[in-house]
Design a protein with these regions (language model features):
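Terminal targeting/low-complexity segments that flank the catalytic cores of oxidoreductases
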Residues: 1-9
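Short, contiguous alpha-helical
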Residues: 2-3, 17-28, 37-84, 125-172
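Active-site rim elements
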Residues: 9-17, 90-97
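Hydrophobic alpha-helical core bundles mediating ligand binding, dimerization, or RNAP-core interactions
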Residues: 16, 20, 24, 31, ...
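Short, flexible helix-adjacent loops and helix caps
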Residues: 32-39, 116-119, 123-124
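Acidic/histidine-rich alpha-helical segments that form the ligand environment
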Residues: 85-123, 133-143
Length: 172
């Protein structure tokens, strides 16, 4: 690996960590605006996911994908993906946040341990091979789409008192 490649790899890892943290915080700010824990479990229809379900799915995905990231298949036998979509309506905000933080801690721990040279390593997800860099980008895309769902649903539920998470559109 050349010096330039090493710097580029370091920069990539730093930017990914920074942007993942940014979307994590965005979701947490949206969740914080929910008036009560019951709203975490609201579904728009029978096929939709609640914020609680998305949180549990993200946590389960992160624990599976980022545990032994370079050495084991990203779909761990211990993961019960279907159960992630059946988050009990009795789960409190505190319980959900504990699971949420556990997933993110696993992700950031694995990401922090990577070196630029690791980015070209081959990793597997459900038996399919990817470069580590490609797997990271795919996971970022997955997480960003689900964070968007969390923000959308929180804004929908709290529309009357919603505080914009970015630059608010003009009000007439």
């Amino acid at each position: 690996m050349t010096e330039t490649e090493g710097r580029l790899g370091t920069h990539f890892l730093e930017v990914v960590a920074q942007e993942l943290n940014r979307i994590k915080v965005r979701a947490e700010k949206a969740i914080a605006q929910l008036a009560d824990d019951r709203r975490l479990h609201v579904k728009l229809d029978a096929e939709s996911n609640s914020i609680a379900i998305v949180m549990m799915h993200l946590s389960g995905n992160m624990l599976s994908r980022w545990t032994d990231f370079l050495t084991a298949d990203g779909e761990k036998p211990s993961r019960n993906r279907n159960a992630e979509f059946e988050a009990p309506e009795t789960m409190t905000r505190a319980e959900l946040m504990t699971a949420w933080e556990r997933g993110w801690a696993c992700l950031f721990g694995a990401l922090d341990a990577l070196t630029p040279a690791d980015l070209t390593a081959t990793v597997r997800i459900r038996g399919e091979q990817f470069s580590a860099m490609e797997a990271i980008v795919r996971q970022f895309d997955h997480y960003a789409s689900h964070i968007g769902q969390i923000v959308f649903l929180a804004k929908h539920l709290e529309w009357e008192r919603w505080q914009s998470l970015s630059v608010p559109r003009r009000r007439q």
